[in-house]
Amino acid sequence: MWQEYYFLNVFFPLLKVCCLTINSHVVILLPWECYHLIWKILPYIGTTVGSMEEYNTSSTDFTFMGLFNRKETSGLIFAIISIIFFTALMANGVMIFLIQTDLRLHTPMYFLLSHLSLIDMMYISTIVPKMLVNYLLDQRTISFVGCTAQHFLYLTLVGAEFFLLGLMAYDRYVAICNPLRYPVLMSRRVCWMIIAGSWFGGSLDGFLLTPITMSFPFCNSREINHFFCEAPAVLKLACADTALYETVMYVCCVLMLLIPFSVVLASYARILTTVQCMSSVEGRKKAFATCSSHMTVVSLFYGAAMYTYMLPHSYHKPAQDKVLSVFYTILTPMLNPLIYSLRNKDVTGALKRALGRFKGPQRVSGGVF
């Protein structure tokens, strides 16, 4: 029975999540087992969804009409996306490594940032490698089960990031506006609840929307006018009425997008109000610069996603959809570590210490988190 397989081979190993423990303090969770869990469940999702293919045509492969359909610019686009992809992996990987190994970064803020980096690495790896491989092999196809898996992972990871960004803004609000209560309001237990809630919310979105999206009967044309299996692009191939499902998707997006984004806006509004009361002009300028850069990235991420998922698909234009999707699926995972972390003096200091560690061990006093 698959239930027994799930408990013995999936749930039990999930309990043994790898943690770094220093001075009896759990510093950072590395939820690779969560990703492993998703991959183990996917065959069952694929089997369930695959049984619905009897309503479709005899061909079970989809064809992407992606970013490389113009030969004169495809080579340049391939090079740019490759650079962005490997930069995102490197920057996020460096962030996770530094937060793990440097005791000065063992704080709630960097704990949450490490999970943002991990989600970004998984997120971009769900979409970009398939694009690059298809270009190198001169093919544009993806199987039905592969499209289902990509759609599920994408929704799960992007949903988790939506929630996490909102809660990270709340963390900054507490740190700046209520510094005396910060150790209580952002305790280790609260941080674990934030991470668990983000992953749960993202997984719920994936489990709810993926089977419905892939269960529609598709017309003879299986050409997805996109570079990955995004719901609005896939729904355009459906031969059935999708109005009810679009309503369900709209409700989900209100919960997944507008609520976290409202938390972000409210948190930064309170932060800016508090910053205006600072006596230091230099401090105000630095705070405004930091908040503006954060809000730019967050607005880009949420805004593009809102346009994609909260408008009826009859209003969508394929060219615009692909450009907007590039912003929040490819660019954002690269920008997040650069904006949130690598410009920070604490992180640059940790990087210098890591590079100079070969000179000899350094004794460092850690934080209380």
Curated annotation (Swiss-Prot):
Primary localisation category: membrane
InterPro entries registered for this protein in UniProt: GPCR_Rhodpsn, GPCR_Rhodpsn_7TM, Olfact_rcpt
Molecular function terms, GO-annotated: G protein-coupled receptor activity; olfactory receptor activity
UniProt cross-references to Pfam families, sorted A to Z: 7tm_4
Subcellular location: Cell membrane
Disulphide bridges: C147-C239
SUPFAM superfamilies: Family A G protein-coupled receptor-like
Gene transcribed to yield this protein: OR2T1
A GO-annotated cellular component: plasma membrane
Name of the protein in question: Olfactory receptor 2T1
Cytoplasmic side: 98-107, 170-191, 269-286, 343-369
Extracellular membrane side: 1-76, 129-148, 213-247, 308-321
Keyword Cell membrane: yes
Glycosylation sites: N56
Record bears the keyword Glycoprotein: yes
Keywords assigned by UniProt, alphabetized: Cell membrane, Disulfide bond, G-protein coupled receptor, Glycoprotein, Membrane, Olfaction, Receptor, Sensory transduction, Transducer, Transmembrane, Transmembrane helix
Function: Odorant receptor.
Ranges that cross the membrane: 77-97, 108-128, 149-169, 192-212, 248-268, 287-307, 322-342
